[in-house]
């Protein structure tokens, strides 16, 4: 654990640096988002009941009061697009559609998140053989999907993956900027996460509130060390309202194939949590 101690010491020393003057923007603190996402635990096997139950538990267990305000529905809610290109939700998993999900989460005093891909198809369609994700990406449907997700359904956050975009060889900056512009026309307060599995570049600050800096995390110590190492020299690119995303946390998993690893020891989990906090990653 010398690696953990060394990194923690370095970051804590860095955190002691203070500024004597603050701009008006800096006086408004916009910390990294904190919440729950369905992907690690369920992948595409999600449902209306699962999401609502998780939201209830976040309130009951005190997570909401601790600042975990986002309930994010990841890949798996898609049904199909109709002849007009309108996205419909999965009839079995979400028979009542997605607006009731957002309304339910909002009713508990929290915010609701959603998922899409910058290309034609989602990661779940490729890695989990979820046929419903084929053609479900936002590519070619930006204004239409933005209105549906954030205007009609009322969601507050979106994770934008890149499996479909990568397959098509699309330009990342152009794609994410186009999506950002379409969302802004509906709701400028939507929080956007770029999930591109590497630091995208300085342009990301204008397109998103957070961005992944590495490949997917797995539930073993070597994977955590890799992610921390990737993020160690990226602190200059993060700041108030714009953060390096070290990926969803893998605490509580034991020998679970969905998160690829044997799981972390309690001490490793503590280090995991602490490092994500020290490095200002979304939780």
Label each region the model flagged.
Residues 1-21:
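Bacterial Sec-dependent N-terminal signal peptides
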Residues 19-52, 57, 148, 190-191:
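N-terminal module-boundary/linker segments of secreted carbohydrate-active enzymes
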Residues 28, 32-38, 67-74, 111-116, ...:
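Structural recognition of the beta-strand scaffold that forms the well-ordered cores
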Residues 38-46, 88-91, 165-166, 264:
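Second-shell loop/turn segments in exported
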Residues 39-41, 76, 117-121, 163-165, ...:
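Active-site beta-loop-alpha junctions enriched in small/polar residues
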Residues 54, 58-169:
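Aromatic-lined carbohydrate-binding/catalytic grooves of carbohydrate-active enzymes
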Residues 141, 189-283:
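Glycan-recognition surfaces
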Residues 156-157, 163-190, 194-198:
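Extracytoplasmic, non-cytosolic globular domains
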């Amino acid at each position: 654990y010398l690696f953990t101690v060394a990194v923690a010491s370095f970051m804590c020393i860095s955190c002691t640096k203070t500024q004597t003057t603050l701009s008006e923007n800096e006086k408004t603190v916009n910390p990294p988002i904190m919440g729950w996402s369905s992907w690690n635990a369920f992948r595409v096997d999600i449902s209306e009941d699962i999401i609502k139950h998780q939201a209830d538990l976040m309130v009951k267990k005190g997570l909401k009061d601790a600042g975990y305000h986002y309930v994010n529905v990841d890949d798996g809610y898609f049904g199909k697009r109709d002849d007009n290109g309108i996205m419909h939700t999965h009839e079995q998993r979400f028979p009542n559609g997605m607006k009731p999900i957002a309304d339910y989460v909002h009713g508990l005093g929290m915010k609701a998140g959603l998922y899409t891909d910058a290309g034609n198809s989602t990661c779940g369609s490729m890695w989990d053989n979820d046929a419903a994700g084929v053609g479900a990406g936002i590519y070619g449907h930006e204004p239409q999907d933005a209105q549906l997700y954030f205007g009609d359904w009322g969601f507050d956050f979106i994770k934008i993956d890149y499996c479909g975009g990568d397959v098509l060889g699309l330009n990342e900056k152009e794609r994410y900027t186009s999506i950002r512009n379409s969302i802004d026309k509906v709701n400028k307060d939507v929080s956007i996460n770029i999930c591109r599995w590497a630091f995208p570049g300085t342009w990301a600050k204008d397109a998103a509130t957070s961005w992944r800096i590495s490949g997917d995390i797995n539930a073993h110590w070597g994977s955590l060390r890799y992610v921390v190492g990737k993020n160690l020299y990226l602190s200059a690119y993060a700041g108030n309202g714009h953060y390096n995303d070290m990926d969803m946390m893998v605490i509580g998993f034991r020998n679970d194939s969905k998160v690829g690893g044997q799981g972390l020891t309690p001490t490793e989990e503590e280090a995991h949590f602490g490092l994500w906090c020290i490095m200002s990653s979304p939780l």
